[in-house]
Each structure stands twice: as structure tokens, then as C-alpha cells.
Amino acid sequence: MAPRVAPGGSQQFLGKQGLKAKNPVSTPNSHFRSASNPRKRREPPTIDTGYPDRSDTNSPTDHALHDENETNINVVVRVRGRTDQEVRDNSSLAVSTSGAMGAELAIQSDPSSMLVTKTYAFDKVFGPEADQLMLFENSVAPMLEQVLNGYNCTIFAYGQTGTGKTYTMSGDLSDSDGILSEGAGLIPRALYQLFSSLDNSNQEYAVKCSYYELYNEEIRDLLVSEELRKPARVFEDTSRRGNVVITGIEESYIKNAGDGLRLLREGSHRRQVAATKCNDLSSRSHSIFTITLHRKVSSGMTDETNSLTINNNSDDLLRASKLHMVDLAGSENIGRSGAENKRARETGMINQSLLTLGRVINALVEKAHHIPYRESKLTRLLQDSLGGKTKTSMIVTVSSTNTNLEETISTLEYAARAKSIRNKPQNNQLVFRKVLIKDLVLDIERLKNDLNATRKKNGVYLAESTYKELMDRVQNKDLLCQEQARKLEVLDLNVKSSREQLQYVSKSNQEHKKEVEALQLQLVNSSTELESVKSENEKLKNELVLEIEKRKKYETNEAKITTVATDLSQYYRESKEYIASLYEKLDRTERNNKENENNFWNLKFNLLTMLRSFHGSFTDETNGYFTLLNDFNASMEELLNTHSNQLLISMTKITEHFQSLDEALQSARSSCAVPNSSLDLIVSELKDSKNSLLDALEHSLQDISMSSQKLGNGISSELIELQKDMKESYRQLVQELRSLYNLQHTHEESQKELMYGVRNDIDALVKTCTTSLNDADIILSDYISDQKSKFESKQQDLIANIGKIVSNFLQEQNESLYTKADILHSHLNDTNSNIRKANEIMNNRSEEFLRNAASQAEIVGANKERIQKTVENGSQLLDSKSKAIHSNSRSMYDHCLALAESQKQGVNLEVQTLDRLLQKVKEHSEDNTKEKHQQLLDLLESLVGNNDNLIDSIKTPHTELQKITDHVLKGTTSLANHTNELLGLGDESLCNLETTIEDTSLVKLETTGDTPSKRELPATPSWTRDSSLIKETTNLNLDSDKKFVRETYTSSNQTNEPDVYDKPSNSSRTSLLRSSRSAYSKMKR
């Protein structure tokens, strides 16, 4: 903040120990003024105090590039302890600090709140334990050093109402013999520290103070009584943008800190305070206490602003600096503070100004283009302190209790944002002593006059209302004079601009006069030329009648030429359309060929994939078949071994029984006369032997039967399943090959039909184009030859009558006509040749494509037949072999069963015979012992013989089973060999087919470079019949003759040739005829 305050008038003198001041003498109840020198406030001389050159619309982005001299606002937080009322209410603490002085504070909400613990960091944080002295030494003392060095500094207190802002800034204002009390605030301590430093420096100085408040957006001086107070106004300093000047504020010089403390006490008593629910002594206004210091500069010092060194002859140089101590009114909630009526209005104005201050802080932090300084007088006064050239310190006071948590967080958030504001402090410029002395002398003289007039009572006494009215009139007249002066300046500028316009108009008039004289001379020359043109017109008038008759004939010829040219243009357009359709057909054919080629390669890839897949599946099936045969051979060998072992066991048991029988017979031979009991014993032993033999044979035959049945059933089911799988694989292969062949055949047929169609369309198109071009060429040649003779005969007459101008005109038209005819004929010839070339190339390509397609179809057909035969042969061979294996297995099984049954029956017969014999022996043993003994011996011999036969019969099935097994093994070996042959044939066929497919490819056309590329044909020449020079013979008058002569003269002087593709003139038609004639003669040759 940097307001320049106009002095209110006081006497000062400059001494060695400083500038001393006498208090002005004033009468509180009357206003006595000298008539010769009435007292009035005088604007001080402009003193450069280093305030920034800023406007309200300046953006902080001008300082985006941070200079090394830029500094952030110093933010200090002071936490107030709990009051007696809060202690009685048992309010909990929400703010915690790290001792008396730190750098952080934490916000801890109660458990019922949604807030969480949050930590804020600032330059310094003072807890409730910190006293006024600690706060002063760590926050204000460094700023005083900067003030002594020539910088402007601002310290302002910001916070909620009732948090101790006024106590921090002012505190206890009492003193005893120059000693401050313990509760003295920052302002009293700053005054004492300042004068202590000045007295110790032994330099001349002058200190003055001002104290005013901002109450309801109105500035009020606190150093004068309410009766003497005049309305203060804030103006922009025109000499320095960004500074403000406050008029109507009293500035008092002080010689020591006691004087300043006395002024502070008087102003504090006049300040607006009131009691609210939140604070018993709540400040209702913002107060600003300003200390202005003028200090003599010592020799040898360097002026940073003017970049010069102070020498010993610098007694007349002073440096000015200011310290602003701002006590802001606290923000408050109307509902909590209980403000009503007047207090509610005060609260609204306070909150509005603080809200504007917050918006200014946000705009500065966000580097906005517009800073709203003008929205409040508070922000206008603090303009230089926020983002300007002043060093600023912000003391934030907050409450530590949980009841004010919301306001505390809001205050800390604003303080945290304010830390980001950057100021660029600058040392104030030096001023000369005489500027300050002059101001002081005038004030002394004015005060002397006022004092003498008061003592002598030589003046005018006025009532207070009259005096105020008089002063208001004087001020209004001063303002009116200023306005009139501004209007005079504007009028002077208008007069100056009017003079300049008058000079410009006079110069323009002179130039216009010269132009008029030149035009008059040109008019005389034009009149002379007009007379000569009239005489020439009379000469041409007689020749015009003859020319019109000849032009009628020329018009007739032109109409015929136009008809022929129109026909040629129509033929040319049709040819272009035919050629465009031909190119389009070629493009479609090319696209179809590319698509067919892609289809062919896809078909080839799919066919190879399926063949390789079939080859893999066929190999897997064959390997499974071989595995099955090996398992079958192993099963047969195992069966043979099992049956052989069982027969050997049976033979061993039978041999053992018969050995026991032989032993019994031997015992029978030794004692023929055995008793019946012995015979019964023999009979019982024979029965036991018989029964055990029958049981062994029965178990053996059952095992053989069951094993043979299981083996036969397994082999049959596996063979049947293998046969089904092989048949299914062959069937799928045949279907896939047949579908691929059909797809290939369909593709080839469609390609043939497409190529035949393309060829037929191209032939028809070429024939049509050729016929049209030949007809057009014949018609054009006949017409050109016919018109040439007529045109040449008439040209001589026309040239003889109309002269050189008409001869040149006709010659240009003739050349243009022949030129266009040559161009048209060349286009027709090029088109015809391109059509022929394209037809030949397309015929060659289509024939070659058809040949390739036919050969490809033959190769695929042959491959199809060979593969089909191979597959059918393999399938038939597989069926036959499977049937043979099945029949052999079945016959072997049946033969095994038959042998087992026959053996069983033979044993049963032998056993039955033995039973009958034994029964007979038992019946007749008693009667015919001797006779039966011999018969018994015979029977035993026959039994031994039967035993041998039985052993032989048992050996015989074993031999037969061995033979059957050998036969089955031979059959399976033969089947494996045939299967290997079939696999070799299948592999060979599949490899041949795969090789054939891989070797088969599309034959691409060779590029010869003779095919004409597609190009854009020129646009069809168009023209209209030019009849501008053909005049009607009827209603002929002089005006039309003059117009015709002018047009003829203009057309004869034109040198620009017409564009070939623009609307042709008569000369273009002549050139077209010439070109057509030469083309026709070439065709005849």
C-alpha cells in the first residue's frame, strides 16, 4: 500500500538531531481565518516514493518470469489461546502447534466431523505461549531494517473477529517513563525501535505519522476531531500509475516515540468499536497507521534506483520510506455475532471488503489478467502491498478452539494462497532537501499567518455551517476550473485538427484545378480526332453496303461450318464416353483378375491344408491299424502258450492217474485173489480218478472256450471299428476332393464366361468407336474440301472490297479454324490408335488367360481322377483284408470250439465205458474170480491202450491249435504287408497331388509397355456462332454504321490469340477447316 497523504499543515524545522515539530494551535468551537490568507489544505509536491507504476487492469503475468529481486509475501500465523468463556464452556482444541514458535500447525477436528487432520506450513507460526515481544522481534523488527534502508513496507493483521488482531497491532498503549508495558502491540514497539535506530545512526531525519480508518467504505481521519474532520478522497496519481493520493488526511510530525504513541492513543479512542456476542470490543472498521521517514543519505552510499554513488557533496539528498501498519476488521457471522440494524450493516461492509481482498489474492495467485483492486477502497489502499513494489508481511490470527474451526480453516486457506503472491520491492528514489524544505516553509508561513490573525482577531468569524458551505463552494469551483481546463485542452486539439483539415482541403482544390485544365486540353484534342473520324466514316459508309451483302453469304457459310463443327463435337464427346467406358471396363477386368488370383491362391492354400491334414490323419489311422495287428499277434501267441500249458498240465495229471492205475494193476497181478474189499477199494480209487480227470478236462475246456471267445470277439469288434473309421476317412477325403474340384471347375467356368464377355464388349465398343470416328472423318473431309473451294473464291472478292483490315481478320479466322481442325483430328487419330492397341492387348490377354485356365482345368481333372482311383483301390483292399481277417478269426474260434467238444465227448465215452466195465467187474467178481481176473487184465491192457489214445488225442488238438496260430500269424503278416503297400501308394499319390498343386500357378501377363496409359482427354471444344459483325440489311442507319466501325476497329487491334479450348472465333473455324483438309489428304495417301 502506498497512499501519498497531503499534509494537514504544521510547523517544522530541521535540526541536527532531527526535524522537530510544533503542534498546531486550533480553536475547537469556531473557525477563525485570516482574510488575507485563508487557511486551506494544499496538495504536497510530488515525491517519488518508489510506488509501482500499475493500473487496475495490469496482470501479474507481466512478472511471470520471476526476477531475483522478487519476494513472496511473508505470512506469519499467531494462534490465540482459549478465553475464560471458552474454558468455562470446556471447548476442545482444534489447532496444535510445535511450541511457542515453529513453522507448521495442524488442524485436528473432533470425531463427529468429516474433516481430517491437515497440516499447514508458513514462514513462522506462533503458539499461544508466544508473547508480544517474541512476535515483534521475529516478524516486525526485520521489516524496520528494510524501512531504514529505503523500502516501503506493509504489515497487516488478518483473521476472524475476536482472534486478537487489534491486541496484536496496538495492544496496551500505556507507558511509564518511556518504558512499554509487557502487553504493548507491534505499532508501539515499532515506534520505539525506529527512533532508537535513528538516534543511534547520528543522521538527520524527519518522521511523520497519519492514522485513519475505513468505516463503511468511507475514509475517516483519526488524528483530528469529528468537528474538524473533512471528507477524504482517493485519487489516482497521474504522475505514477498504480499509486493513490488521499486528500483530507492530517499528517503530524513527531520527534520521538512518545509523540507517536500519543497520536496512536488519540486515534484509537476515535476508532469505531462495538460489543458483539463474539467480542466485547470488536473493531468495526479497518485502520491504517502510516509512518513516513525522510532520512539524509550518507556519503559513500549507492543509490540502487538511480545507479549512482553518493559523494561527500550530497547534503541535499534525502531518502523517503514508509511503514504501513494495518489492522483489518475481522470477518464474522451475523448469526453468531448477533449484529442487528447498524451493526449488521457494518458487518456486511466488512465482509464485502474482506471478500474483495480474497478475490484479489486469488487473482494474484492465479495470475489473472484483471485484478479487482477497484471493487473496494480497502484493496485500492492495499494495491501496492499486494503484488507491487512494497515488502509485505501478513500476520494471521486464528482461534485454537473447535467452535471456530470453520472460520479458522477458511482463514488459513486464504493465508496459504497469499504466500504465493510475489512482490518486487524497490528502493525509493532520492529526493532533494529543497523540495521538502519548500513544502515546510510554505506550511510555516501559512501557520504564522493563521496564528497572527487569531491573536489579533483580524479575520472573519463564520458559523460552522456557513464555513462548510463556503468551503464546499470553493472545492466545487476548483473542480469546475479543472473541468474547464480539460475542455479547453480538448478545444485546442479540435482547432488544431480543423486547421490541418483546412490545409489538406486547399491542397486538394489546387490539384483538382490542375486536373480540370488537363481535361480541357484533352477535350480539344478529342474534338479534333472526332472530326477526322467523321470524315473517315463517310468514306466507309459507301463501302459498308457492299460488305453487308458479302457478309450475308459469309454468315450462311458460317452456319454450315457451325453445323459441321457441332457434329464433330458430338462425335468427339461420344468417343470420349466410349473410351471412358472402355477404360472402366479394363479397370473392372483388372480388379476381377486380381480378385480371381486371390481366390486361386486361397483355394490352393486350402487344398494343400486339407491334403496335409488328411495325410496326417491317414498316417495316424495306419499306425493304429499296425498297432492293432501287433496286439492281435501277441494275443494269439499268448493264447497258444496258455492252451499249451493247460494241455501239458492235463497230460501230466492223466499220466499220473494212469501211473497210479498201473500200480494198482501190478498189485492186482501180484495178488489175484484179493478179497472183495480190495476190489471195492480199487473200484473206488478208479472212480475217484475218473472224477478228477473229468473235472480237470472240463475246467480246461471251459478256460479254452472262454479265452477263445473273448479273443475272437475283441478282434472282430476292433476290426469292424477300424474298417468303419477307414471308410469314413476315405469318404470325407473323396467328398473334399470332389468339392474342391467342383469349386475349381466353377471358378474356371466363371472366368471363361467373364473373359468372353469382356472380349465381346471390347470388340463391340472398338467397332462402334472406329465406325463413328471414320464417319466423322469422312464427313469432315468432304465438307472441308467443298467449303475450301467456295471459301477461297469468295475470299479474294472480300479482300479486294474491304481492304487490308478485313483481309487480316479473315486470315486470322482461317488460321484459327485450321488449327482447331488439326487439334481435333489429332485427338481423333490418337483415340483411334489407342482403341486399336487396347483391343489387341485385351484380345491377347484374354486368349492367354483362357489357355491358362483350360490347361489348369486339365491338370486338376487328371489329378482328381488319379486321386479318386487311388482312394477307391485303397478302400477296396482295406475291405477285403478286413473281411479275410474277420473270417479267419471266426473260423479259428469255431475250430477251437469243435476240438474242445470232440475231446470232451471222447473222454466222456471212455469214462462211461470204464464205468460199465468196473460195474461188471464188481458184479461178477465173486463168481468168476479167475475168469474175471484174466478179463480184468485184458481190460487193464485195453485201458492202457485207451490211455495212450487219449494222450494222443489230447496232443492232436495242441498240434492243430499250433497250426491255426501259425496260419493266423501268416495272415496278419500278409495283411500288414498289403497295408504297407497301400500306405506307400497313398503317400505317393498325396505327395504327387501336393506337388502338382504347389507347382500349379497363374500365368501372369508380360508387361510390354505398349499399352496406352489412362489419361485425361481435353475438354470438348465448344463455340457459339459469332454474329456480332453481321448486321441486318434492314433498318440500317448511321449509328449502327458507327458502332460497326468501332467494333471492327477494336477487333482488328486485338493481339491476344483465343484459347484453343475456349469459345472459338471465326478464325478458329477457318483453322479447323484447314486442319481437317490436311488430315483427309493424309488418310487418302
UniProtKB/Swiss-Prot annotation:
The keyword ATP-binding applies. Pfam families: Kinesin (PF00225). SUPFAM superfamilies: P-loop containing nucleoside triphosphate hydrolases (SSF52540). Residues 72-421 form the Kinesin motor domain. Residues 24-37 have a biased composition (Polar residues). It comes from the Eukaryota. It is found in: Cytoplasm, Cytoskeleton, Microtubule organizing center, Spindle pole body. SMART domains: KISc. The modification Phosphothreonine is found at T1011. CDD domains: KISc_BimC_Eg5. Residues 436-604, 715-740, 897-955 form a coiled coil. Residues 1065-1078 have a biased composition (Low complexity). One of its GO terms (cellular component) is cytoplasm. Keywords: ATP-binding, Cell cycle, Cell division, Coiled coil, Cytoplasm, Cytoskeleton, Microtubule, Mitosis, Motor protein, Nucleotide-binding, Phosphoprotein, Repeat. Sequence repeats lie at residues 987-998, 999-1010. The keyword Transport does not apply. GO terms for biological process: cell division; initial mitotic spindle pole body separation; meiotic spindle assembly; microtubule plus-end directed mitotic chromosome migration; mitotic spindle assembly; mitotic spindle elongation (spindle phase three); mitotic spindle formation (spindle phase one); mitotic spindle midzone assembly. Residues 1-70, 1049-1085 are annotated as: Disordered. Belongs to the TRAFAC class myosin-kinesin ATPase superfamily. Kinesin family. BimC subfamily. Could be a spindle pole body motor. On transition from G2 to M phase of the cell cycle, the spindle pole body duplicates; the daughter pole bodies seed microtubules which interdigitate to form a short spindle that elongates to span the nucleus at metaphase. Mutations at cut7 block spindle formation. This is Kinesin-like protein cut7. The gene is cut7.
